[in-house]
């Protein structure tokens, strides 16, 4: 992602902290969203780009979800993807952990792939998303699981562990730290800093669905422009004016000159096909709940995550904005007293589990054992 497109104007210390601890924007209330009865209603052994993966569909929390699964025995590890991704982001982890004796499951999250995508924006708040995760355990007949989340999956995983520690007994968060609920409405803070300049989170919150209209017009361009390493070469951006009025997001990024070595053409084709089916509105609705999530979390301010936790990110991930291990540890230690380790992988960017699968898998196995 083009750094200038995300950072203009210069980020102040206050807003930098807000962005580093982005996970706290998604805090929520456990009341009012008890998981409904869940069940597996269909199993499909075929139609998977990853050999050995079994697809199944479950009914839970008012929606139909697709699960990708490997390994039928052993402790359950639940992988939660972010934006703009799919279950397929976890392909390397599904193979490695199932080979190590774990039962591993990666859903298409609400609004993605072949999982249902409700129209109502409030159906994507963190309360609903956390209830979806519990519903998966219920459908699989599992009492507990380790939950692993990346990008938007990180706050979902964090809050699932916060609200349901008896079900999610270990937590791994990737790229997006968790530091509890902040004092200021996060969207108000962003608007105060960026004003009439472009910032993608504010763009995703504009009325009228402008963001998904842009992204749906060319899913391949968006995904190929996002799925890159920090040093991947790009074309020059078509828009360099920082003002929102100058245009949308894609012309600001700069198209990729080629795929990174960790992403094959077949990988990209599969993920593109998933967004051609589902569109981008579901994923954008996660951003549209940032303010709602903040408003309904007041009674969670004093809660902390009690389960053992690992944080993992690429050292060049722009979400952490150059934070050191010590800075990240300090920002999370109050909200996660049992934060066992912070791992930053050098020369790795945002797509950590795909860019560095060997190191990611080893970190997961060390933590799980």
Placement of each model-derived feature along the sequence:
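Bacterial N-terminal signal peptides
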Residues: 19-29
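Conserved HGGG/HGGXW glycine-rich cap/lid loop of the alpha/beta-hydrolase fold
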Residues: 69-116
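Signature tryptophan residues that serve as conserved aromatic anchors
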Residues: 83, 87-90, 152, 158, ...
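Boundary at the C-terminal end of the N-terminal hydrophobic targeting segment
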Residues: 30-32, 38
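Flexible "cap/lid" subdomain of the alpha/beta-hydrolase fold that forms the substrate-access gate
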Residues: 40-44, 48-53, 63-65, 112-148, ...
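Catalytic active-site module of serine/aspartate enzymes centered on a nucleophile-bearing elbow/loop
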Residues: 338-369
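Bacterial N-terminal signal peptides that target proteins for export
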Residues: 4-19
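Conserved beta-strand scaffold positions in the cores of enzyme catalytic domains, especially
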Residues: 55-57, 104-106, 341-344
């Amino acid at each position: 992602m083009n750094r200038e497109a995300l950072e203009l104007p210069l980020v102040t210390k206050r807003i930098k902290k807000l962005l580093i601890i982005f996970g706290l924007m998604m805090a929520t209330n456990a009341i009012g969203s008890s998981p409904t009865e869940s069940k597996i209603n269909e199993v499909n052994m075929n139609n998977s780009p990853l050999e050995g993966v079994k697809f199944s569909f479950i009914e839970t929390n008012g929606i139909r979800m697709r699960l990708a699964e490997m390994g039928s025995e052993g402790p359950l590890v639940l992988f939660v993807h972010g934006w703009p991704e799919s279950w397929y982001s976890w392909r390397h982890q599904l193979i490695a952990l199932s080979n190590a004796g774990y039962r591993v499951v990666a859903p298409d999250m609400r609004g993605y792939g072949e999982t249902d995508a409700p129209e109502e924006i409030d159906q994507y708040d963190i309360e609903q998303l956390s209830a979806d995760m519990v519903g998966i355990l219920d459908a699989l007949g599992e009492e507990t699981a380790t939950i692993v989340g990346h990008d938007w999956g990180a706050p979902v995983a964090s809050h699932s562990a916060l609200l349901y520690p008896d079900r999610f007994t270990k937590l791994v968060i990737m790229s997006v730290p968790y530091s509890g609920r902040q004092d200021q409405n996060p969207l108000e803070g962003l608007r105060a800093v960026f004003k009439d300049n472009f910032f993608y989170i504010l763009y995703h919150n504009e009325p009228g669905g402008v963001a998904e209209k842009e992204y749906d017009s060319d899913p391949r361009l968006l995904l190929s422009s996002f799925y890159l390493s920090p040093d991947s070469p790009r074309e020059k951006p078509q828009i360099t004016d920082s003002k929102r009025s100058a245009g949308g997001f894609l012309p600001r990024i700069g198209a990729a000159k080629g795929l990174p070595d960790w992403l094959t053409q077949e990988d990209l084709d599969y993920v593109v096909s998933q967004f051609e089916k589902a569109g981008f509105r579901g994923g954008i609705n996660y951003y549209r709940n940032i303010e709602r999530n903040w408003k309904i979390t007041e009674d969670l301010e004093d809660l902390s995550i009690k389960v053992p936790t690992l944080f993992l990110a690429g050292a060049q991930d722009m979400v952490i904005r150059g934070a050191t291990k010590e800075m990240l540890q300090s920002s999370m230690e109050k909200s996660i007293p049992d934060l066992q380790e912070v791992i930053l992988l050098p020369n790795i960017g945002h797509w950590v589990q795909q860019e560095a699968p060997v190191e990611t898998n080893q970190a997961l196995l060390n933590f799980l054992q």
